[in-house]
Amino acid sequence: MLLVEKDDLAAATSSWSTKLIHGGLRYLEHYEFRLVGESLAEREVVLRIAPHIVEPLSFVLPHEPHLRPAWMIRAGLFLYDRLGGRMTLPRSFGVRLDDSRWGAGLQHRFRRGFVYADARVDDARLVVLTAMSA
């Protein structure tokens, strides 16, 4: 096998990457269930085979009632938790933001929200490890 790079291996990775290993929660809104399921399944693979470079993260999604009803967000997160056969990360859940640690740093107008999990990766190391294993 031959690998040709313009610069160093993974040279531009950090500037273009979000460093997230995620399933694409936003794609559920466009009914891209297959894409989300495949992405979540791949996230599980990376979490399983490279735990030394992947860090689970919890995200707080404040609820804005004028944008979407809470039931819709709950339904989306329910699907997100199940589409990829989630086994490694915790399932999502609803929280009261005005009396919990989850609301720290958020504007006081947010009363409730949702917590879901994805993961962050050392993207340059992932590229190098992938190239080495090819």
What are these regions (language model features)?
Residues M1-S17:
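Glycine-rich FAD pyrophosphate-binding loop
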Residues A12, I49, T130:
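Active-site-proximal flexible loops/turns
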Residues F114-A134:
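Helical element adjacent to the flavin cofactor pocket in flavoenzyme catalytic cores
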Residues T13-S14, M72, D123:
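Alpha-helix N-cap/helix-start motif
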Residues K19-G103:
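Dinucleotide-binding Rossmann-like beta1-alpha1 core, especially the glycine-rich loop
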Residues Q107-F114:
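Short glycine/proline-rich turn/loop motifs
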Residues W16-L20, L126:
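Catalytic-loop motifs flanking and including active-site residues across diverse enzymes
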